[in-house]
Design a protein with these regions (language model features):
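Structured beta-strand/loop patches that form or line metal/cofactor-binding pockets in enzymes
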Residues: 16-59
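C-terminal binding/interaction regions
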Residues: 1-23, 83-143
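Intrinsically disordered, low-complexity segments enriched in small residues
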Residues: 7-11, 52-55, 62-63
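Alpha-helical support elements that line or immediately flank enzyme active sites
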Residues: 72-84
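Conserved short-loop catalytic and cofactor-binding motifs
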Residues: 60, 64, 118
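Short, thiol/selenol-centered motifs that function as redox-active sites or metal-ligating centers
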Residues: 64-70
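Functionally engaged cysteine thiol sites
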Residues: 41, 66, 126
Length: 143
């Protein structure tokens, strides 16, 4: 098996996104909480949420992940503000289909900075962390 060039995956744009997580600190005072862990790499993410009028009104993250997972989390956090819950759910499903090779790069959220990670199945779990934590938070709200 030939090693893939690391430079293609870890671009300056991706690494810059990873540093932007500081703009979305944990918010334990928010009413909804979800967690996700990648089975392939052990990365994990905790998401704090508030939903008002069926829209995301506030969020915070605690991310312990590789640069791919951090960049995915930053893209997610930048995108979800004031989005309807249903739109976030549908986008997560589109991301999963795209990673599985069953769909195009989702247009609803700009994942271009991490698109190269699709070729690295070991990173798919890290990319999906925020979406899975979101789903977990919704389940916890109804559980």
């Amino acid at each position: 098996m030939t090693a893939r060039p690391v430079g293609k995956l870890y671009t300056p744009e991706m690494l810059h996104l990873a540093t932007q997580l500081a703009e979305f600190p944990p918010r334990p005072e928010l009413p909804l909480h979800g967690e996700a862990r990648s089975a392939t790499c052990g990365s994990k993410l905790a998401l704090d949420l508030e939903i008002a009028n069926d829209e995301i009104s506030a969020s915070g993250l605690l991310v312990q992940a590789c640069a791919v997972g951090q960049a995915s989390a930053a893209l997610f956090a930048q995108w979800i503000d004031r989005r309807p819950v249903s739109e976030v759910t549908v986008a997560g499903e589109a991301v999963e289909r795209w990673l599985a090779g069953d769909g195009r790069l989702p247009e609803c959220i700009d994942l271009a900075p991490i698109a190269a990670a699709r070729d690295y199945p070991g990173r798919h779990g890290a990319i999906l962390l925020p979406w899975r934590a979101f789903s977990d938070a919704l389940c916890n709200a109804h559980g």
